């Protein structure tokens, strides 16, 4: 890693992952389009294959110089020991789970986890003989009662990307350590800038780099960051699955890192300004965003996080589903889409009840997930203002 500790975070991001030994070079790293690495001697070839999982040029699937730059940059920013890039966030989740779990094992999974993570445990892991217990994301020390003799890991997502519950990560890590359990967290919402998993003792951090890291909705990319203990098994799992990212996606990931700080500042600023306006509206029942004092998770967020991203939710007062759809169809700046983290603002009707096993999600008027993009906040508010009365049949 580079010795950039004397700099502030914005400068560290620009310098992250770079090999600055060369006197003359382009400011941007090249795109390496190649599958085969050639060697001049048998000794070089054998040495390369022996270390193929450890950021060594051996074969295209194991990475290129730009892949290694991306991985080193993310590890530096997030504070992990090492990172491995994957073809998507889902690939990162699968590779992590399969690296840690085997037939007969048991995992504790937060009930606020991403839907695909839930599906993986209910289908892929179940078919492999691995059992899952979902736990309430607001659980405290009571999680000890869910730990079995064959429990191997606790999977966290703080906050969840539909209902935004903040988990007490330090407490859960302490309990996990006492029981020799691996801790895995989905840190996509927190990003490497706003939440530092390894400072809090997490073993493995996963992110859908497709979202804030890439930041422009033009690449699919995932990344797994680890401590030293789990680096080797995570790398081998990801590489053996063949979940390698394409060279253009890696390039776009590196580009995204360089502007991550300034983009997140705008996302957070816009989200907070929109939320302050939404607080004044009689159509809104509750705002789901841990960075506001009214939220039940604010105390933990304020203690553990360094900022908040642009994704939040709102629950509506009782209204007709047809009116919700009518309002969404008329919005001009908020488009409907399943992803988030790009420059564009998005809005999506969601039903968290479909993704709950441990407790019910009872909200009469429906729930909307909103991503505040990089547009002017006043324009975004006006777009909502011009159409929100539809929810009251006006």
Q: What do the predicted segments below correspond to?
A:
Residues 272-332, 336-341, 352-362, 392:
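Conserved small-domain helix->loop->beta segment predominantly found in fold-type I
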Residues 122-123, 131-133, 144, 318, ...:
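PLP-dependent enzyme catalytic core of the Aspartate aminotransferase-like
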Residues 54-56, 219, 307-311, 365-369:
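Short, solvent-exposed beta-strand edge segments and adjacent coil->beta transition regions
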Residues 2-4, 13-22, 83-283, 288:
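Conserved PLP-enzyme active-site core in the AAT-like
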Residues 1-64, 72, 368:
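N-terminal "arm"/small-domain region of PLP-dependent enzymes with the aminotransferase-like
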Residues 253-262, 310-318, 368-373:
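Short, well-ordered beta-strand elements within core beta-sheets of diverse protein domains
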Residues 41-91, 116-123:
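Conserved N-terminal alpha-helix of the aminotransferase class I/II PLP-enzyme fold
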Residues 18-20, 33-40, 211, 259, ...:
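Glycine-rich beta-alpha junction loops
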């Amino acid at each position: 890693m580079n010795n950039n500790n004397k700099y502030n975070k914005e400068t560290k991001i620009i310098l992250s992952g770079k090999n600055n030994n060369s006197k003359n070079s382009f400011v941007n790293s090249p795109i390496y389009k190649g599958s085969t690495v050639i060697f001049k001697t048998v000794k070089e070839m054998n040495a390369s294959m022996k270390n193929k999982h450890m950021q060594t040029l051996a074969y295209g699937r194991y990475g290129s110089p730009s892949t290694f730059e991306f991985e080193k940059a993310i590890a530096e920013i997030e504070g992990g020991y090492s990172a491995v890039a994957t073809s998507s966030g889902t690939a990162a989740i699968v590779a992590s789970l399969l690296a840690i779990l085997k037939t007969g094992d048991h995992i504790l999974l937060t009930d606020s986890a991403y839907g695909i993570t839930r599906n993986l445990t209910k289908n892929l892991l179940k078919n492999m003989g691995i059992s899952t217990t979902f736990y309430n994301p607001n659980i405290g020390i009571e999680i000890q009662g869910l730990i079995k003799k064959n429990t191997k890991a606790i999977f966290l997502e703080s906050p969840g990307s539909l209902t935004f519950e903040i988990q007490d990560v330090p407490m859960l890590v302490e309990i996990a350590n006492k029981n020799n359990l691996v801790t895995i967290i989905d840190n996509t919402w927190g990003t490497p800038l706003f939440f530092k998993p390894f400072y809090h003792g997490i073993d493995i951090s996963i992110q859908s780099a497709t979202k804030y890291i890439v930041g422009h909705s033009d690449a699919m990319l995932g990344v797994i960051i680890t401590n030293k203990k789990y680096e080797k098994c995570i790398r081998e799992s990801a590489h053996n699955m063949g979940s390698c990212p394409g060279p253009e996606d890696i390039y776009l990931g590196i580009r995204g890192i360089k502007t991550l700080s300034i983009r997140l500042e705008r996302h957070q600023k816009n989200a907070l300004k929109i939320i302050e306006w939404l607080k004044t509206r009689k159509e809104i029942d509750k705002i789901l965003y841990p960075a506001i004092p009214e939220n039940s998770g604010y105390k933990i967020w304020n203690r553990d996080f360094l900022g908040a991203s642009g994704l939040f939710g709102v629950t509506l007062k009782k209204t007709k589903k047809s009116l919700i759809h009518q309002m969404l169809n008329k919005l001009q700046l908020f488009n409907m889409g399943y992803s988030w983290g790009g420059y564009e603002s998005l809005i999506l009707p969601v039903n968290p009840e479909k993704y709950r096993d441990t407790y019910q999600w009872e909200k009469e008027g429906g729930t909307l997930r909103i991503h505040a993009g990089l547009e002017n906040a006043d324009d975004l508010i006006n777009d909502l203002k011009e159409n929100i009365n539809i929810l009251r049949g006006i």
